[in-house]
């Protein structure tokens, strides 16, 4: 007598193949593979296998990802569910400009992890700050997923969380990468501090800090080191929200090797330990002094700009007359007080105009108190450069646009939703790589010497181009001759056919 199945006939008719078994799980019909096995008794039985999909009543069998992959590899899948149209231009442009950065990553990380880090950073550079749970959608719809289709890495939330955790916990490869950047830099290094709002109550680094009232949320503090001459970032590091920059910078200086470096930093990094470390191993520093500094108060009482004057020319169109006073504190340390006469005169005129307009915040008493100190800079240095070079180095440091400034001001980098300590430091490294790629794009756009063209414009024009799958090849679509010519002037010529 044949045993009757408990599965309805209108479900059984969708059974995908032999050696499969349908199981009713409260109305959900799951399909499993099975195979016949000989039992110790000599009789035959079945051994249940893995889940291959489910049957939807009235619709049919729906294979899961694992079974689809198996069918595809065996050539048995009647149709392949895959993306046939991907974004191309902005990704290909950034990869063209930053191929050397991928090479550096491959020198420090296993090849597949280097590609995963690089893909993450390229997406961040193309779209600005993007939360970790949004990266996978960009990746799957981009030429990156075609380029790295034979790699096993994923770009989903869990996969990227593991990646960031590993980078932060097993930090030697990232440190090797950063040290290489430092060693190959111009040795003119600026260090800058930023405050970032944190929206994660569980973030190990998020605490109340000096900007908590303004941010309406806990904060983390980010310190960036970057090369003043080449305009590239060298190091990103996040610290506790309650930390102060002058202590955090000591940790950075002690954790990396710096030699024969000229540091240009702001007065938030002024501390005996930081200044000592910035003066060892052939290093020197330039730092502005706060008004509360005892030497500033002393010098102000009798200040006369008797040491000399010079013309400062930051570019071909701009110049300023600078007078200065210089004195030595010891054999290696000087204080130089600079006064930009043009800036001083400009601010005097502006303030007087505000007084004439009746602005309540302006008064003759305040004018008399402040007018002598507009455009005045008190700088302390252990550099042996002459005064004009010290001033030029200090002013040049403020002209650098870091990737953090770009995303903070233009790409909605307002808060982090990161909790894990290691993930936070892993993200620091992703930010560094993203900043490196962004600096390459900045340089390429700057070299166009077209004031009306920005990095946004270039990415937008390149972003129109797509690759569409035809047979086994990807073909370039949605191009415009004018855009192709502009991108070609940057050295980037889009591929018409991409074989993957």
PLM features: residue spans?
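Acidic, metal-coordinating catalytic cores used for nucleic-acid/nucleotide bond scission
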Residues: 264-273, 291-294, 423
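An anionic, glycine-rich sequence signature occurring as long contiguous blocks
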Residues: 218, 238, 282-396, 464-500
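Short amphipathic alpha-helical "interface-anchor" segments enriched in bulky aromatics
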Residues: 389-418
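Secondary-structure capping and boundary motifs in well-ordered enzyme cores
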Residues: 115, 152, 187, 216-218, ...
């Amino acid at each position: 007598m044949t045993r009757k199945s408990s599965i309805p006939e209108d479900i059984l008719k969708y059974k995908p193949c032999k050696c499969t078994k349908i199981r009713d799980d409260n109305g959900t019909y799951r399909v499993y593979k099975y195979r016949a096995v000989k039992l110790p008794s000599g009789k035959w039985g079945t051994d249940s296998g893995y889940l291959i999909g489910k049957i939807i009543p009235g619709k049919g069998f729906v294979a899961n990802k694992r079974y689809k992959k198996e069918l595809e590899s065996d050539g048995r899948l009647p149709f392949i569910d895959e993306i046939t149209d991907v974004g191309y231009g902005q990704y290909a442009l950034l990869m063209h400009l930053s191929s050397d950065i991928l090479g550096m990553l491959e020198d420090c990380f296993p090849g597949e992890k280097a590609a995963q880090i690089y893909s993450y950073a390229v997406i961040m550079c193309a779209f600005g700050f993007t939360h970790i749970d949004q990266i996978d959608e960009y990746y799957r719809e981009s030429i990156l997923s075609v380029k790295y289709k034979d790699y096993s890495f994923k770009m989903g939330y869990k996969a990227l969380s593991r990646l960031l955790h590993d980078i932060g916990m097993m930090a030697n490869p990232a440190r090797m990468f950063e040290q290489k950047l430092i060693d190959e830099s111009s040795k003119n290094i600026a260090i800058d501090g930023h405050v970032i709002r944190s929206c994660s109550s569980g973030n190990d680094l998020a605490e109340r800090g000096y900007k908590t009232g303004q941010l309406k949320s806990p904060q983390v503090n980010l310190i960036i080191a970057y090369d003043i001459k080449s305009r590239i970032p060298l190091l990103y590091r996040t610290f506790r929200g309650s930390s102060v920059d002058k202590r955090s910078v000591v940790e950075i200086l002690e954790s990396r090797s710096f030699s024969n470096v000229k540091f240009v930093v702001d007065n938030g990094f002024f501390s005996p330990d930081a200044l000592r470390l910035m003066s060892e191993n052939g290093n020197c520093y330039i730092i502005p002094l706060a008004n509360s500094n005892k030497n500033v108060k002393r010098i102000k009482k009798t200040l006369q700009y008797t040491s000399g004057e010079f013309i400062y020319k930051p570019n071909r169109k701009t110049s300023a007359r600078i007078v200065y006073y210089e004195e030595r504190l010891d054999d290696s340390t000087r204080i130089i007080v600079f006064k930009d006469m043009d800036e001083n005169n400009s601010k005097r005129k502006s303030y007087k105009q505000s007084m004439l307009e009746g602005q309540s915040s302006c008064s003759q008493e305040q004018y008399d108190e402040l007018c002598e100190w507009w455009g005045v800079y008190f700088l302390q240095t252990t550099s042996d450069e002459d005064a004009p070079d010290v001033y030029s180095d200090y002013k040049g440091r403020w002209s650098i646009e870091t990737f953090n400034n770009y995303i903070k001001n233009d790409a909605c980098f307002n808060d982090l939703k990161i909790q894990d300590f290691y993930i936070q430091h892993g993200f620091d490294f992703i930010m560094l790589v993203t900043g490196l790629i962004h600096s390459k794009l900045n340089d390429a756009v700057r070299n166009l010497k077209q004031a009306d063209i920005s990095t946004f414009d270039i990415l937008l024009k390149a972003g129109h181009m797509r690759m569409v799958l035809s047979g086994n090849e990807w073909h370039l679509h949605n191009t415009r001759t004018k855009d192709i010519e502009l991108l070609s002037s940057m050295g980037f010529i889009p591929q018409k056919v991409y074989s993957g």
